[in-house]
Regions:
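Feature marks short, surface-exposed loop/turn motifs that line or immediately flank catalytic pockets
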Residues: 149-151, 190, 226, 260, ...
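N-terminal capping/small domains of soluble enzymes
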Residues: 14-92, 98-101, 288, 336-341, ...
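Active-site-proximal beta-alpha core segment in soluble small-molecule metabolic enzymes
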Residues: 51-217, 231, 239-242
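Short, Lys/Arg-enriched N-terminal segments with co-localized hydrophobic residues
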Residues: 4-16
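Charged (often Lys/Glu-rich) extended helix/loop segments that serve as interaction or gating elements
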Residues: 239, 256-395
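Conserved, mostly hydrophobic/aromatic
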Residues: 35, 58, 87, 143, ...
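Glycine-rich beta-strand-to-loop/alpha-helix junction loops that act as flexible
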Residues: 188-189, 218-227, 256-258
């Protein structure tokens, strides 16, 4: 009970240090202290387990924060030529790159900005490996494997579902890997536990174990949510150490994305209208689920709103509606201690990963600003967006 009191007291104290009135609306705000907490934990796991942990840009690519990230983790994983270039230019290191399919036009750029390139299929490997050799680069090539096992329950995020386009299944490989394949890569997790990884590793060894003595590295992909409060970090470290004891020659690579930015910031919005239809009250905000919080609708999941709860009978209760023309751009319900009013601020928690990298400008809705609340409790504006950003997307 005392520890719970301390946690609640700390949360109230942290909120009080952030002057919401200084922040434009809508705005994504990342908190530097929380980011550093995550980075410290990830670096500790990396060092204690003796593995290489790199940042997955597909979840978090807020490059103006990379000077902070570089203090802890200097490498990243990319899934396109643009992400690979961002890694090279802004993080200062070549990327570990994987894509479901490379093109003739893009592959020279992939080679320029990458240290590792993973191919999704044997046909892609055979098509592009001659370009790797002809380039004379020191890029290390790998194959993505599909262990046909995943604990992910949402089909949208399950790369091992029957018929998946992701990775090579064991029945397509013979007794040896093609010449030039130096590593294997699997990605089966999504905000998962170390026990999910343990079960996946067992399947990887069962199906692909014959190749492990002959490759240099094994990339375990992303989805390792090691910064979540209930994640068993000690079990993860023991699991990785045990695997390394069986395969001491292997470099083990992990590429989480959400874990870096988990619970590190929020989306500040403002109530701009309140409407009622058949007894359902909807507070319309100056942001959008479909434009600015797309995973809420895709997963779907209901985000937390600061100082709000799930619906409670007898309390002021609302749907929250996005400010787009999409009928389904809403979620709910939430209850508040007092009725909402136009002009009230609503703070959507944990909105830094898989948000900024996925936003769009549907309906010409203004994009939220980007900001950092730094470790000295100052607001640092990274970017504001305007009409030209919308117009130039279609130039």
């Amino acid at each position: 009970m005392f520890s719970l009191y301390l946690h609640i007291h700390y949360e109230i104290l942290r909120y009080s240090m952030i002057d919401i009135n200084k922040i434009p609306s809508p705005c994504y705000v990342m908190e530097e202290k929380l980011l550093r907490n995550n980075l410290s934990l990830i670096k500790s796991v990396k060092e204690r387990a003796g593995v290489n942990i790199i940042l997955a840009f597909k979840a978090f690519a807020l490059w103006k924060a990379f000077p902070i990230v570089r203090e802890y983790i200097p490498f990243s994983t990319a899934s396109s030529k643009f992400e690979a270039r961002l890694a090279f230019e802004e993080l200062g290191s070549p990327a570990h790159t994987y894509s479901p399919a490379y093109t003739e036009a893009d592959f020279p750029l992939i080679l320029r900005y990458s240290s590792h390139v993973t191919f999704n299929s044997l046909s892609q490997f055979h098509r592009f490996y001659p370009m790797v050799r002809a380039d004379g680069s020191r890029v290390s090539c790998g194959l993505r494997i599909n262990p046909e096992y995943s604990d992910v329950e949402t089909d949208l995020y399950n790369p091992c579902a029957p018929g998946s386009r992701m990775g090579v299944t064991c029945d397509l490989l013979g007794d040896t890997l093609p010449e030039g394949v130096e590593g294997l890569h699997f990605h089966t997790l999504c905000e998962s536990t170390s026990y999910d990884l343990e079960r996946t590793l067992a399947e990887v060894e069962r199906r692909f174990g014959r190749f492990l003595p002959h490759v240099k590295w094994l990339n375990m992909g992303g989805g390792h949510l090691m910064t979540r409060k209930d994640y068993d970090v000690e079990h993860l470290i023991a699991l990785l150490k045990g695997f390394k004891e069986r395969y001491p020659h292997l470099e083990l690579i992990m590429e989480p994305g959400s874990a870096f930015a988990w619970q590190t910031g929020f989306l500040l919005t403002t109530v701009v209208d309140i409407v009622e239809n058949h007894g359902v009250k909807t507070a319309i905000i100056d942001a959008s689920f479909t434009c600015h919080m797309p995973d809420c609708l895709e997963m779907p999941y209901k985000p937390a709103i600061r100082f709000a709860t799930d619906a409670v009978e007898g309390k002021p209760t609302y749907r929250i509606g996005g400010n787009s023309c999409l009928s389904g751009d809403y979620m709910g319900d939430w209850s508040f201690d007092k009725p909402l009013e136009i002009g009230d601020k609503l703070i959507f928690e944990d909105m830094i990963h898989y948000t900024i990298v996925k936003t769009n400008m549907f309906n010409g809705i203004p994009h939220p600003s980007l900001a950092l609340w730094d470790k000295d409790d100052r607001l640092v504006m990274y970017r504001t967006f305007g009409y030209e950003d919308y117009k130039n997307r279609m130039d």
